[in-house]
Amino acid sequence: MERTLVILKPDSVKRKLVGEIISRFEKRNFTILHLKMMNIDRELACEHYSHVKDKPFFNDMIDYITSGPVVVMVLSGYRVIEAVRSMVGATSNFDSKPGTIRGDYGYHRFENLIHASDSCESAEIEIKRFFPELDS
């Protein structure tokens, strides 16, 4: 069964959307294999976003993801990566369609509520990054 990593970012937690978002995944019959609330430190944030380290928004992104607690989870299911990304919507809240998580709840260009792995390869890397205890 395919796995993916999902991060409910600080604005999801602050706005009390965690239960609603998790409920959407459960209604699609995805299994929550692992879930935890944590604070992401700068080192972990820089590692996670290293692919955009040369972009002008990098420091703002790091400040945002480290600004408060996040909920990190591993979901499994049939074609879960593709399905979750479809449920999440476009990266920009303004480009996300109604019915998607970002389309329904997003209101800020930069604070976009949620991260979801974009491929099997990145999912496995991200799962090891945020759940290193599972790698033994």
UniProtKB/Swiss-Prot annotation:
Binding site for ATP: 9, 57, 85, 91, 102, 112
Organism: Acetivibrio thermocellus (strain ATCC 27405 / DSM 1237 / JCM 9322 / NBRC 103400 / NCIMB 10682 / NRRL B-4536 / VPI 7372)
Family: Belongs to the NDK family.
One biological process term in Gene Ontology: CTP biosynthetic process
Alphabetic keyword roster: ATP-binding, Cytoplasm, Kinase, Magnesium, Metal-binding, Nucleotide metabolism, Nucleotide-binding, Phosphoprotein, Transferase
Gene3D superfamilies named in the record: Nucleoside diphosphate kinase-like domain (3.30.70.141)
GO cellular component: cytoplasm
Location of the active site: 115 (pros-phosphohistidine intermediate)
First-tier enzyme category under EC: transferase
SUPFAM superfamilies from the UniProt entry: Nucleoside diphosphate kinase, NDK
Membrane-spanning intervals of the chain: none
Name this protein carries in UniProt: Nucleoside diphosphate kinase
